[in-house]
């Protein structure tokens, strides 16, 4: 039995990517044969995943974990697999947040919502990042077992020493410095942080 993860993008610092990497590490430590496949692999993470288009054939005994967070044709390939299928639902941002801001992202989000609905009766089990996400899946017709499990956080990242260069640049500069960690996007409400 292999446990394979599929996700659209593996990117440094991304929460979904961190979750996939942490799951891989835990599964490996438990002795499972495990791999990650992604459509896009950021250069910093080359070697941590394989190209999704080169994914090996699965057997009935295998388990595929599909990280769902945006629209991609990968969802339809996942649907067709004959092994055990688990969807890890990371939520899809409501498309209206991107009106007049980023039409490409809005199209991917609308597509993601449609694919979420299409997968409703085609997965064996779901993990949702929150109770809200779980209820969202139920409202879309998911009847399979769904459990809530927050994303894994790479806690060792918090043990790293801060960049001396950055500290020197901002400490004692006479300003109040606000650090926002996340993508720049209307739904992240950077203006509320300020």
Predicted features by range, described:
Residues 1-12:
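Nucleotide-activated donor-dependent transferases that construct or modify glycoconjugates
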Residues 8-10, 69, 151, 177-185:
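Conserved donor-binding loops in enzymes that form glycosidic bonds
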Residues 16-27:
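Short amphipathic alpha-helix
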Residues 33-43:
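A short beta-strand-loop structural module common to alpha/beta enzyme folds
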Residues 44-122:
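Extended catalytic core of nucleotide-activated donor transferases of GT-like folds
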Residues 117-164, 172:
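Donor nucleotide-sugar binding/catalytic pocket of nucleotide-sugar-dependent glycosyltransferases
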Residues 127, 168-188, 194:
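Conserved donor-binding/catalytic core segment of Leloir-type glycosyltransferases
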């Amino acid at each position: 039995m292999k446990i394979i993860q599929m996700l659209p993008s593996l990117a440094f610092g991304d929460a979904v990517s961190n979750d996939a990497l942490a799951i891989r590490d835990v599964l490996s430590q438990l002795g499972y044969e495990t791999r990650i496949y992604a459509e896009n692999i950021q250069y910093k993470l080359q070697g941590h995943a394989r190209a999704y288009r080169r994914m090996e054939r699965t057997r009935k005994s295998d388990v595929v974990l599909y990280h769902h967070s945006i629209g991609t044709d990968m969802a339809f390939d996942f649907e067709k697999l004959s092994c055990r299928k688990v969807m890890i639902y990371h939520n899809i941002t409501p498309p209206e947040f991107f009106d007049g801001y980023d039409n490409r992202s809005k199209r991917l989000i609308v597509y993601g919502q449609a694919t979420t609905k299409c997968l409703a009766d085609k997965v064996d089990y779901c993990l949702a990042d929150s109770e809200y996400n779980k209820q969202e899946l139920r409202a879309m017709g998911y009847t399979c077992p769904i459990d809530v499990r927050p994303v894994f956080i790479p806690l060792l990242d918090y043990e790293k020493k801060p960049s001396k260069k950055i500290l020197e640049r901002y400490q004692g500069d006479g300003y109040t410095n606000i650090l926002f960690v996340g993508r720049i996007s209307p739904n992240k409400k950077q203006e509320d942080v300020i």
